[in-house]
Amino acid sequence: MQDRHVGRRPLGPRRPWQLRLLLALACAAAFVSPIEATRAADYPSRPVRLFVPYGAGGVGDLTMRLLARKLSEQVKQQFVIENRPGAGGILAMTEVLRAGADGYALGEVGNGQAISASLFNKLPFDVLRDFTPVSVAAFFEMLLAVPGNSPFRSLKDIVEAAKRSPGKLNLGAINPGSTQNLSAHLFQQVTGADFALVTYRTTPELLTAMLRGEIDLAFDYYAGLISEIDSGKMRILATSGEERNPLLKDVPTAKDAGFPQYVVVGWNGIAAPAATAPDVVKVLNAEINRALAAPDLQEQARRLGLDARGTTPQEMRDRLSADIAKWRGVIEKAGIPKQ
């Protein structure tokens, strides 16, 4: 039976121009690969800008400064922190995209951006589509604290009191739309307790209000509260993590205290524009994980209540996706209007 070639001419001898074209393509392929390899091998060959969507001194800023310092030592190029606070991280991440996808502009991404994805009506970017995750840098939990002279000795005590007298106890947190604020909403949702939620602009304002006796329970991170806790002016009823904090071994988690659905783990990591070369992302991931494993960085992070621990890019993407879904549910259930 005769072979038939539908829509295709039988193969025949190569014409000279075809041979020249194939040779040119082969040379081009051989030429591109070393350039890409060299770019990854030489990266970084100049300072790297790391955009942080928070002001100086907060947990997000402190995490990135620890990491940037160690990365600068390792690769012999400066990782320069550029703080761009405001607008739920929009300003910082827009700067990253504007700077280009060459690996020399990176952004801090974490639970804050997961919240922004559901809190804002329209963002100038999609954090999952327009960025490629590199690695998580640190995890951190919330502390649920009361004044040092509070009559409440356990989380169960204060929840039961809030149920007996709805709206009578004040629950303090910072910034509407912040992880702390939404964690307070989630706490009421999973416990059924009815607190009056009082919002403050900054952690120092929150602390001042608590020390004045204006609020009965506060939600914030370890780094923000620990000095007042060490002085005895505040007392921790529980932490929000999966496991007990090694610095606070006598303090139960909310799960231990009888509220297994209340788990909040904040985190911050690094992302690059989506078009960044995979080899550059691979180099960054390896260097970040090496930096985070350094004993001196581990000790510095531990003193700030941070669990400094790297991940793969896919693990960071999975966590970001899960947190977007989690906080969207909290926002919708709380009836928080989109901005």
Region locations from a protein language model:
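N-terminal secretory signal peptides that target proteins for export/translocation
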Residues: 1-16
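Bacterial N-terminal signal peptides
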Residues: 20-33
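N-terminal (or domain-start) structured segment
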Residues: 39-129, 168, 189-217, 228, ...
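An extracytoplasmic/periplasmic, membrane-proximal ligand-sensing/linker region
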Residues: 45-47, 190, 256, 278-339
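Hinge/capping helix and adjacent helix->loop/strand transition within the periplasmic-binding protein
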Residues: 98-104, 118-205, 254, 267-300
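Short beta-strand and adjacent tight-turn residues that come in two discontinuous sequence segments
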Residues: 108-109, 136, 200, 219-220, ...
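A ligand-binding cleft/hinge motif common to bilobed small-molecule-binding domains
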Residues: 112-122, 181, 188-190, 217-251
